[in-house]
Regions:
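Extracellular glycan-interacting surfaces
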Residues: 1-352
């Protein structure tokens, strides 16, 4: 149980999409005071923050992925310093810790590249992705830059790693990220199911991979060899736009899914809306969580305070942030204190 004097801070990264890259930002919310602050000192101008990590043992340490590479803060986001990598000046879209050693980090880039650091981000080395062959259906379309939008490792076998590629399918590594190949067999071989937005593995289900796409949630047994569509309440006819997936840090049987309607694989004209889903049996069954509101934009991400697991948070792309301090039974709402647009909406969220 968390100490009663533990203060939770929520961090959200803002960025644009496509040609709408004029704005961005990083904001911190203090749950104890209800105050928002901009936390961009040391970050690049108009930072496009698409990835955030918070150290599992020291919540003062944060990592941010920006359009100019990765950054680190040692004081809860008050100040940031750039981390030197061999791929300077490129967009970082995902960050992940080794499940048992937070000194080991992985960074996923656009265009598709994966780097690893073994000393808390001080030094980085490029992993081998040269053998990756993307699904043909994603290559004959108008050119789409393959970006690594999600990274994870199997907690029971960290040498087994997975990378979600937006409009590119799933990559797998059997050697701790040293080399990668494409995993494209099974259910999710149509174009709209190859547009991945995240990947997770739970310690309660070793060897089972969960991926989210613009139309559905899928499960791949036997390290992604056999895929099946997991049913949730559809947000539009034919599916749900899934953007965030989280395994609770203190309970590997508990999972949350951020989903929505509008855009992606939804029929033209579908109005945007967001929803939060929860599974208490490692993804076997899902229920929609009553957060007391229907956000007018797609739900984007979920975060749980590792030191106070009753504190659950979720956010919608256009700035709505929902907070529960009783395991999701009751909720309150706040909003990022800036105007949202296509050039600025929420990408990542972490807390601690």
């Amino acid at each position: 149980m968390a100490a009663t004097n533990h203060h939770t801070y929520i961090y959200v990264g803002l960025a644009g999409e496509g040609q709408y890259l004029a704005e961005g930002g990083l904001y911190r919310y203090a749950a104890s005071t209800g105050e928002w602050q901009s936390m961009t000192q040391g970050l690049p101008p108009t930072p496009q923050v698409r990835a955030l990590l918070i150290h599992p043992d020291n919540p003062a340490v944060l990592y941010a992925g920006t359009q100019c590479g990765p950054y680190r803060s040692d004081d809860r986001g008050e100040h940031w310093e750039a981390l030197e990598t061999p791929r300077e000046g490129r967009d970082v879209w995902s960050l992940a810790f080794h499940p048992h050693d937070p000194e080991v980090l992985y960074a996923g880039y656009e265009p598709c590249a994966i780097y690893r650091s073994e000393d808390g981000g001080a030094h980085w080395r490029k992993m081998h992705t040269d053998a990756v062959v993307f699904p043909h259906i994603t290559t004959y379309m108008p050119p789409v830059c393959k970006r690594v939008i999600g990274l994870t490792a199997d907690p029971g076998n960290p040498s087994e790693m997975y990378a979600a590629i937006e409009v590119g399918g799933l990559l797998g590594s059997r050697d701790g990220g040293e080399s990668w190949t494409s995993l494209i067999d099974g259910t999710y071989v149509r174009n709209n199911t190859l547009d991945l937005h995240g990947v997770q593995v739970s310690a309660a289900a070793p060897g089972v991979v969960y991926i989210i796409t613009q139309v559905a949630l899928f499960r791949g047994r036997e390290r992604g060899r056999h895929w099946e569509h997991i049913q949730i309440d559809e947000m539009f006819p034919g599916g749900s736009y899934c953007r965030g997936l989280l395994v609770a840090p203190n309970d590997p049987t508990l999972m949350y899914l951020a989903a929505g309607a509008g855009g992606g694989g939804a029929p033209a004209g579908t109005p945007e809306a967001g929803a939060l889903f929860r599974s208490c049996d490692t993804g076997e069954t899902w229920e929609r969580v009553d957060i007391g509101d229907t956000p007018p934009s797609r739900m984007a991400q979920i975060a749980i305070d590792r030191a106070a697991p009753a504190r659950v948070y979720c956010c919608a792309q256009r700035g709505q942030v929902y907070m529960s301090h009783d395991h999701g039974h009751t909720w309150q709402k706040t909003h990022v204190p800036v105007e949202m647009s296509r050039s600025r909406h929420i990408y990542p969220m972490v807390c601690g």
